[in-house]
Amino acid sequence: SQYIGPAGEVLYFNSETGDRGKSNLPLPGDDVGRTNIVILASKNLGKTMAIYRAAFGLGQGFVMPTPNKLVAEAQGLEAGAMFRLGFITLRERGNAIHFDEYTDSSAPRQAAKGMLPQACAMVSFNVDNLDAVDADFVADPITEYGGMRSAVFKGPAGELVELIEADR
């Protein structure tokens, strides 16, 4: 389900109401679980997906055209406007990156100098080995989070991606 939040953000919620054994959703830790799909908007879907596939060693994923009423409304387009959507699954069950290709009618998010843009500006992922990730980090990795190394890179759409080296 899609909802507009109090700051105008688009929130997606999913729930498991069927057979848990057949579901691809991760098990929640409580009544509300954790993020399992992150959404990245980009003006060049193919390039953006290719960068993530290379950086994380991900599979091909898929791309399909689809209508999205909320995105169309936010961009001042007709409700039936078609958008290209991409989807790449991650290692853990039910986790994925969902890519939306925005049209030229969408404006870049504005940010004050030295500040993050409005809405989601950063996401974190666990990785096995920071040194194996093909990314230009904004600074050398640091040790935090109880002794785990982490580093941040700037993605192709201007997003910040924190990688945390974690044992699984």
Residue ranges and their predicted role:
Residues A119-N126:
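Low-complexity, glycine/alanine/valine/leucine- and proline-rich hydrophobic stretches
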Residues S105-A107:
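Eukaryotic modular interaction domains in large regulatory/scaffold proteins
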Residues S1-G33, I39-L40, Q60-L90, G94-E101, ...:
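Vicinal oxygen chelate
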Residues N44-Q60, A132-D134:
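Amphipathic alpha-helical segments
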